[in-house]
């Protein structure tokens, strides 16, 4: 299995739905023996330029380990979800588990809570 990093930009009006989206995508990944190593909810942030006449978006970062088949399925889900403004899937060489610079500027308690959540999801397998 390969390691991937996914960044999602969700429509700001759908910010309340982000946790359900993450849960849905997490089950797709974990049901196919994939593992989520890092999950960060960066919250609503200002865009550097308007996308679809929007100036803000809700950002989510996911680092995971999964097969190509799972990534193809996940890519299809991301493409056809109207709430997702943009998504980027990158293949990375190594597992990344430490907090990103975007989250380091926020409260460290939030980071540990998110990491605990992803560890609980992975331990359920």
UniProtKB/Swiss-Prot annotation:
InterPro entries: Ribosomal_bS6 (IPR000529), Ribosomal_bS6_CS (IPR020815), Ribosomal_bS6_sf (IPR035980), Ribosomal_S6_plastid/chlpt (IPR020814), Transl_elong_EF1B/ribsomal_bS6 (IPR014717). GO terms for cellular component: cytosolic small ribosomal subunit. One of its GO terms (molecular function) is structural constituent of ribosome. The keyword RNA-binding applies. Keywords: Ribonucleoprotein, Ribosomal protein, RNA-binding, rRNA-binding. Signal peptide: none annotated. GO terms for biological process: translation. Binds together with bS18 to 16S ribosomal RNA. NCBIfam families: S6 (TIGR00166). Belongs to the bacterial ribosomal protein bS6 family. This is Small ribosomal subunit protein bS6. The lineage of its organism: Bacteria, Pseudomonadati, Pseudomonadota, Gammaproteobacteria, Candidatus Palibaumannia.
């Amino acid at each position: 299995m390969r390691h991937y990093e996914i960044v999602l930009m969700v429509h700001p009006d759908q910010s309340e739905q982000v946790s359900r989206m993450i849960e849905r995508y997490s089950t797709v990944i974990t049901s196919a023996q994939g593992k989520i190593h890092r999950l960060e909810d960066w919250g609503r942030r200002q865009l550097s330029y308007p996308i679809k006449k929007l100036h803000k978006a809700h950002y989510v970062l996911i680092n995971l380990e999964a097969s190509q088949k799972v990534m193809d399925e996940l890519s299809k889900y991301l493409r056809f979800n109207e709430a997702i403004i943009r998504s980027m899937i990158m293949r990375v060489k190594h597992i990344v588990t430490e907090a990103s610079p975007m989250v380091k500027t926020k409260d460290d308690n939030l980071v540990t809570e998110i990491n605990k959540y992803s560890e609980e999801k992975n331990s359920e397998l």
